[in-house]
Structures are given as C-alpha cells and as structure tokens.
C-alpha cells in the first residue's frame, strides 16, 4: 500500500493506522455523523479498529488530520468502478467524505475534497469524478458544489448504506472544464 500524504494549508490527508482506533471511535461514535454518510455509529474502539482494518486500509482512503492540533477530524477517499455506489465508467471514480461534528461548517470538507480531486485527476488520471449525497444532507451538496460538482438530475437508492433503502441520494458529477485543483 502506498503511503501518500496529501496536504494543504490546514490539513494533512494520510493513511489510516490501527493505532488511530481510539481517535476514530471518539468521532465515529457521534450519532449525528455516521447516518448522514450512510453508516452506523461505532459502538466500541474494537469496532473502529476493525473498520480501519477492513474498510480504511487501502490506497484510496485517507484520515483527514488538522495540522495545528494533529487530531483526526474525518475521512475521505474514492471508489473505483468496482466499488462505487453508483454506476460509473471503468476510468471514473466516486468520491466520499465525512467530518466530525465539532468541525462542521469550517471549510474542512471543501479543503480536503480539493486535495483529493487534484490527486484523482492529476495523479490517478480518472476521466470523470462522481459523488452522491443524501437529499437530507444539504451541507454535503454545498461542499460538492463549491468544488465544481453539478447535479446530474439522477436520484439513486443505495440499499447497502444505512438509510439508503428509504432515503434517496442525489448523484453529482464534477465539471472539470477550465478547473484547477
């Protein structure tokens, strides 16, 4: 697994480590966080450790770390054609992210997503980048719009996500013409 670290003025995106389990549990046990992103709140440090092992330990997922405090504040990554929630092309990816509640409305998701988009376009050379968000999460829609995503008009059900069998997700696509990240 590559150990790429991406960084901006305030943030560091780095690979997850099993030693992050306690920090992950602190932010992923908040009932206001997981369901907005389609997963259940974590119930134990061991569950968080297992999520790091089974889900986050790959070349496409990063911990979002605040440079100033060195605290993990969220998670960001991309999914390829084989693992995407939505039907995308083989040379496309879908991005996803979440941030702990104390860090909402601070521009952290937008800053982290811009880092990831640069990586996806300039390093991984994906052709198109897609995203989706629950209709009931307008803050996520605003993050995507700030980064250049536009509504495709498509709605989707993601029954494997918590709430995805009853709540629709809006599918958005990145408009890359003339954009730099």
Where do the protein language model's features map onto the residues?
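Acyl-donor (CoA/ACP) binding surface of acyl/acetyltransferases
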Residues: 1-32, 65-181
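A short hydrophobic/aromatic micro-motif that marks alpha-helical segments and, especially, helix-coil
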Residues: 44-45, 59, 163, 179
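A short helix-loop-beta-strand connector motif used in the catalytic cores of GNAT acetyltransferases and
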Residues: 52-63
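A short, aromatic/hydrophobic, helix- or strand-capping loop or linear motif
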Residues: 37-41, 61-66
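Conserved GNAT-fold acetyl-CoA-binding loop/helix
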Residues: 32-53
């Amino acid at each position: 697994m590559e150990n790429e670290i991406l960084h901006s003025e305030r943030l560091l995106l780095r690979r997850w480590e099993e030693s992050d389990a306690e920090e992950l549990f602190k932010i992923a046990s908040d009932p206001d966080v997981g369901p907005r992103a389609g997963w259940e709140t974590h119930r134990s440090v061991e569950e968080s450790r297992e999520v790091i092992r089974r889900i986050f330990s790959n070349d496409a997922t990063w911990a979002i770390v605040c440079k100033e405090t060195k605290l993990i504040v969220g998670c960001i990554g991309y999914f390829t054609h084989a693992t995407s929630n939505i039907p995308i092309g083989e040379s496309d990816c879908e991005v996803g992210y979440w941030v702990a509640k104390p860090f909402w409305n601070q521009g952290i998701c937008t800053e982290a997503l811009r880092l990831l988009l640069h990586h996806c376009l300039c390093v991984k050379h994906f052709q198109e980048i897609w995203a989706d968000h629950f209709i009931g999460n307008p803050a996520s829609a605003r993050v995507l719009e700030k980064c250049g995503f536009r509504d495709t008009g498509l709605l989707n059900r993601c029954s494997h996500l918590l709430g995805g069998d009853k709540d629709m997700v809006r599918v958005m696509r990145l408009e890359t013409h003339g954009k730099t990240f």
